[in-house]
């Protein structure tokens, strides 16, 4: 029988302890199946990782493949991470690539296994356009929030160089929001050319942490270690983190004592009846057993029941304004909102396509006309509001109207500070409520001294008994008395009646008072925040099983031994404050260190009236320094005194700070009241320009106005040409501003030969002149004046710039290219008769900025270059060259055609045009292609890009390679034009009949040996340099042409002549005396003409018709016909 009771007792104990978790009893029983399921979920840590691959144009080919290899290697390492203890990792991976668009493949929803994930990453294809990291971060954040698992660890691995497209939104706010929501970022730089500040802005790392590089051979191990630490930190917190529940019931007493001594087995009883007997009486409770040893710390308990919702906290500070997000689907129309503040002007949008011709935009603001006569009123038009006009003359103040009626409108913005008005009359005195304590005002002026003379000091008399307290006296305050000794505290007198006197000087510091009575206990504080999770305890013993069936009632056990004395119980609640004890004797007056500020005590008991102290008048001390102004006293209980005389007006106070507050809701329009009184003359500023209204119908033309000339307005944007208006009537305007200097005009035709003048008298012999210029000095002078020489200025040329505007170039380098193009244009004579220039700007699309027939002015050409927009996407070089071939179809026959390609990367593989075919077509149409390639030799794609540059260029010598764009402008101009034009060295050789000039007289420091002289270029022209030559009688500039036919040996031989030749007028053929006229047709050929001033022949371009007779087919024919002597 005892054995059955003992078993029942053990089962009851195990059932009781199973309801207890970490010293708290749960409020209700739960299924053990659910408990086991919770344990299984608590031992698994969910991990979601997103790989972001940079698929922009700057990471094509090698870098893009390297990113995919890195994802493949790191994903294997991630699945090799093993957690400690009984924890398990449940990992899912996702990947996305970004450029100007985002492609998510694979997402979390399609996760199967690691091998499938790696295959999808390897199948990624390059997008190859601009870098927009904002959209990559926003899509990754949205993917983790939508498909990531709740309470899991979320990690984003971003690979980029941090150099985004100029139109990329700011990534700071979106990355901060993602980190606040629990997403961790790890950024990896693609190369050493990286914007480290932006990567740290995204990841939130400090500047002391080094930047991770994709080229680092140990990168996979570094990130594996970082992820291992991150997972261990976040997963531990997830498992042991328990929600704070309501306080549990008080715990049970200590464990039961040991069971009593087993009794002897009694004799077997007779079998009873089959009927169940009644339950026996409950036996008396046993004596508590000995208190058991303190058990080990158990594991973290299961989360308790969720606590009650706390009181709402205060509103946090207003956060910074977020950047504009991606446009979502249109939502349902909401209620009418409040009127918001005027927004900041947005960035300029992209240029739209030209619309259909219609009513033109507003033209340039015209000059103000004379005051016109008022015309007849026209019909009411429906049009858009114009710009605010100038301020009109001030009107006469109107009469004061009746006060208006209506609801108060919204508070307007603070106006400008007006002039100080005159002092108003004294208003009715109505005592208001006591205001808040204002700031301490400035010290007032010293008052007028009181009337009276100070008496002599009397002899101190005997101390008399204190008399009764008299009524409050009236009179002027006397002079300040000497500081007496501290007397005992007297009783508090009644409240006085009278005017408050001036504030007295601060007294000496009093003795410390008696300690106050302890204050009452404060109210219970609010529930505290959840504490940090404690360290995981050691493994506990296996849990108890479920209670078994109720056993038979056992026999009453013997009385146990007396237990040991228990530990003292918890401290009881704080008692009520006791009765105040008698005052103790004053202690020593040595002040101790100040203690912590205690709780505010209750009001003390008023003390007894003290006896008057003994006062011995001492000598008058030196007046102490003026003490600080004390705080204003409390409001008195007296009656209001007699109103004093009106004081002098005080100085105006300082202007208060502008209030800060949100704009209130706009009220409903009130009932229109009668017109109010005319206000004072306002001083305001012109308001902001209103929004442009809808375009109105054109109104009828008004009568011609008669106006006076106004001030010249600022130049507005160029509008579309409008219809020709009727002839106006007005006065002539002011003289316009001096325009910019135009291009230098072509040299005029030579005039007709004048009749010979009468011979003059022989002059006196002049003094001997200085030595003439040497040949080297003449060469240097021509080089410095002519630059590339007259050849480039006069040679007919068709030149097309093909400019790379892809993402890898960048906006700064694109600006350098534009400056370079404008500088190159200055080296040629830009007009329709000589050189014509076209421009192609390309990236993933091709923009024809200017064709060959469009510009004949350098200013217009440079303006078109300045207006070119940076595209910042892919590199479609083949399509751009095909556009250049199409542009050369308008070239003049027989004129040299040159295409100059400026790029920094190889063409995109997705380009529809084939580069080899486009280059072959250019070669078949005699188009020379020069290539300027900007790429470093240590670039991984250098070899591929260099082969492509050689493929594009007509000749390997037409390829120029630079490490960066900064050296483009200074080192290329002369060198490139020595290739495009004829070699300047051969030009100087043919003039002076000698070898190359000495070093130092080359093309702006460039060695002329870099250009190979072409033997067919020949000039037969003598250059005369004398001291007495008339300045107006200069030799004409020679003209050249490229691609001239090779001359015969007889033509190539020039007969040496002296540098100084005397002009001869006796030419037999009249053609030699005609002025040079090249004609006006387009079939240009090379001819020779005779120059009488220098008695020599020179080449020129003959248009094919309508020229002068002074032209010959060869130099020999010209010399034999015209040169005499």
UniProtKB/Swiss-Prot annotation:
Annotated Pro residues bias: 642-654
Subcellular location: Secreted, Extracellular space, Extracellular matrix, Basement membrane
SUPFAM superfamilies: BPTI-like (SSF57362), vWA-like (SSF53300)
Domain BPTI/Kunitz inhibitor: start-end pairs: 1072-1122
Collagen-like domain span: 243-274, 301-360, 383-405, 501-544, 545-583, 730-769
An example Gene Ontology biological process: cell adhesion
Composition-biased stretches (Low complexity): 437-446, 1045-1056
Disulfide bonds: 1072-1122, 1081-1105, 1097-1118
Record SMART domains: KU, VWA
Annotated family: Belongs to the VWA-containing collagen family.
Name of the molecule in the record: Collagen alpha-1(XXVIII) chain
Organism from which the protein derives: Homo sapiens
Taxonomic classification: Eukaryota, Metazoa, Chordata, Craniata, Vertebrata
Gene designation: COL28A1
């Amino acid at each position: 029988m005892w054995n059955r009771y003992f078993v029942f007792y053990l089962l009851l104990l195990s059932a009781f302890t199973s309801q207890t978790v970490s010293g708290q009893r749960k409020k209700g029983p739960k299924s053990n199946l659910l408990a086991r399921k919770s344990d299984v979920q608590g031992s698994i840590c969910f991990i979601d990782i997103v790989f972001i691959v940079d698929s922009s144009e700057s990471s094509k080919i090698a870098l893009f493949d390297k990113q995919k290899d890195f994802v493949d290697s790191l994903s294997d390492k991630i699945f090799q991470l093993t957690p400690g203890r009984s924890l398990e990792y449940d990992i899912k991976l996702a990947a996305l690539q970004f450029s100007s668009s985002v492609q998510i493949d694979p997402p979390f929803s399609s996760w199967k296994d690691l091998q499938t994930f790696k295959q999808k990453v390897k199948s990624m294809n390059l997008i190859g356009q601009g870098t927009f990291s904002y959209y990559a971060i926003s899509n990754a954040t949205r993917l983790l929030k939508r498909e990531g698992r709740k309470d899991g660890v979320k990690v984003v691995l971003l690979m980029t160089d941090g150099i985004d497209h100029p139109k990329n939104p700011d990534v700071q706010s979106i990355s901060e929001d993602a980190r606040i929501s629990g997403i961790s970022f790890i950024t990896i730089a693609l190369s050493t050319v990286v914007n480290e500040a932006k990567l740290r802005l995204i990841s939130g790392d400090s500047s002391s942490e080094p930047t991770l590089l994709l080229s680092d051979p140990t990168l996979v191990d570094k990130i594996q270690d970082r992820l291992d630490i991150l997972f261990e930190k976040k997963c531990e917190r997830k498992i042991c983190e328990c929600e704070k529940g309501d306080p549990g019931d008080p715990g049970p007493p200590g464990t039961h004592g040991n069971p009593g001594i087993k009794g002897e087995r009694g004799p077997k009883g007779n079998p009873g009846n089959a009927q169940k007997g009644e339950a026996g009486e409950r036996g008396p409770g046993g004596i508590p057993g000995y208190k058991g040893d303190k058990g080990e710390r158990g594991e973290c308990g299961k989360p308790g029941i969720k606590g009650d919702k706390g009181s709402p906290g205060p509103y946090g500070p207003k956060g910074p304004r977020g950047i504009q997000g991606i446009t979502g689907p249109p939502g349902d129309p909401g209620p009418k909102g409040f009127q918001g503040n005027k927004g900041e002007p947005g960035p300029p949008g992209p240029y739209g396509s030209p619309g259909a011709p219609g009513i033109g935009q507003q033209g340039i603001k015209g000059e103000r006309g004379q005051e016109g006569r008022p015309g007849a009123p026209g019909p009411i038009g429906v049009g858009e509001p114009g710009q605010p006009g100038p301020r009109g003359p001030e009107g006469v103040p109107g009469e004061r109207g009746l006060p208006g009626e209506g609801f108060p409108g919204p508070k307007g913005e603070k106006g400008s500070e007006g002039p100080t008005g005159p002092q108003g009359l004294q208003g009715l005195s109505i005592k208001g409520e006591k205001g808040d304590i204002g700031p301490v005002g400035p010290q007032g002026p010293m008052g007028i001294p009181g009337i009276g003379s100070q008496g002599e000091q009397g002899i101190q008399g005997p101390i008399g008994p204190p008399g009764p307290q008299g009524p409050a006296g009236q009179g002027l305050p006397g002079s300040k008395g000497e500081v007496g000794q501290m007397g005992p505290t007297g009783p508090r007198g009644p409240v006085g009646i009278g005017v408050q006197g001036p504030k007295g000087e601060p007294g000496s510091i009093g003795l410390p008072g008696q300690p106050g009575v302890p204050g009452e206990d404060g109210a219970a504080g609010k529930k505290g925040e959840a504490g940090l999770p404690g360290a995981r305890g050691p493994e506990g013993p296996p849990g108890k099983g479920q209670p078994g069936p109720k056993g038979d009632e056992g026999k009453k056990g013997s009385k146990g031994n007396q237990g040991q004395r228990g530990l003292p119980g918890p401290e009881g609640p704080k008692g009520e404050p006791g009765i105040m004890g008698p005052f103790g004797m004053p202690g020593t007056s040595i002040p101790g260190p100040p203690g912590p500020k205690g709780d505010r005590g209750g009001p003390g008991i008023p003390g007894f009236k003290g006896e008057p102290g003994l006062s011995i008048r001492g000598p008058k001390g030196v007046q102490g320094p003026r003490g600080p102004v004390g705080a204003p006293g409390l409001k008195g209980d007296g009656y209001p005194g007699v109103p004093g005389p009106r004081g002098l007006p005080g100085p105006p106070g300082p202007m208060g700070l502008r209030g800060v507050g949100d704009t209130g809701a706009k009220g409903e329009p009130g009932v229109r009241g009668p017109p109010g009184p005319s206000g004072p003359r306002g001083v305001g500023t012109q308001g902001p320009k209103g929004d442009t209204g809808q375009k109105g119908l054109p109104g009828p033309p008004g009568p011609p106005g008669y106006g006076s000339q106004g001030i010249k307005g600022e130049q507005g944007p160029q509008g579309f040409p409008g219809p020709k208006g009727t002839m106006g009537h007005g006065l002539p305007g002011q003289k316009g501003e001096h325009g910019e200097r135009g291009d230098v005009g072509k040299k005029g035709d030579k005039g007709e030969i004048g009749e010979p003048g009468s011979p003059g008298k022989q002059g006196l012999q002049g003094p001997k002149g200085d030595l003439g210029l040497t040949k080297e000095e003449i060469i240097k002078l021509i080089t410095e004046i002519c630059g590339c020489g007259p050849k480039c200025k006069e040679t007919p040329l068709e030149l097309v710039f093909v400019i790379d505007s892809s993402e890898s170039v960048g906006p700064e380098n694109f600006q350098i290219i534009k400056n370079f193009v404008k500088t190159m244009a200055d080296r040629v004579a830009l007009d329709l008769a000589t050189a014509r220039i076209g421009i192609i700007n390309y990236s993933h699309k091709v923009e024809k900025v200017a064709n060959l027939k469009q510009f004949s002015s350098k200013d217009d050409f440079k303006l078109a270059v300045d207006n070119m927009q940076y595209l910042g996407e892919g590199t479609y070089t083949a399509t751009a060259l095909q556009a250049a071939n199409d542009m050369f179809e308008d070239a003049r026959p027989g004129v040299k055609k040159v295409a100059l390609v400026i790029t920094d990367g190889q063409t995109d593989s997705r380009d529809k045009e084939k580069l080899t075919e486009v280059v072959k077509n250019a070669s078949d149409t005699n188009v020379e292609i020069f290539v300027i390639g900007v790429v470093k030799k240590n670039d991984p794609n250098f070899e591929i890009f260099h082969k492509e540059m050689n493929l594009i260029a007509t000749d390997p010598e037409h390829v120029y390679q630079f490490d960066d764009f900064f050296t483009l402008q200074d080192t290329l101009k002369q060198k490139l034009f020595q290739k495009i034009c004829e070699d300047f060295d051969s030009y100087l050789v043919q003039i002076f009949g000698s070898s190359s000039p000495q070093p130092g007289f080359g093309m702006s420091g460039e060695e002329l040996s870099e250009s190979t002289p072409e033997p067919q270029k020949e000039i037969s022209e003598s250059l005369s340099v004398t001291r007495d030559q008339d300045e107006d009688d200069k030799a004409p500039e020679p003209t050249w042409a490229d691609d001239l036919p090779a001359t015969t040996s007889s033509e190539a031989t020039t007969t040496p002549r002296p540098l100084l030749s005397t002009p001869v007028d006796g030419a037999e053929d009249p053609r030699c005396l005609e002025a040079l006229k090249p004609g006006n047709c387009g079939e240009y050929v090379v001819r020779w003409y005779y120059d009488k001033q220098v008695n020599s022949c020179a080449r020129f371009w003959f248009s094919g018709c309508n020229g002068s007779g002074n032209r010959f087919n060869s130099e020999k024919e010209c010399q034999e016909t015209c040169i005499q002597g």
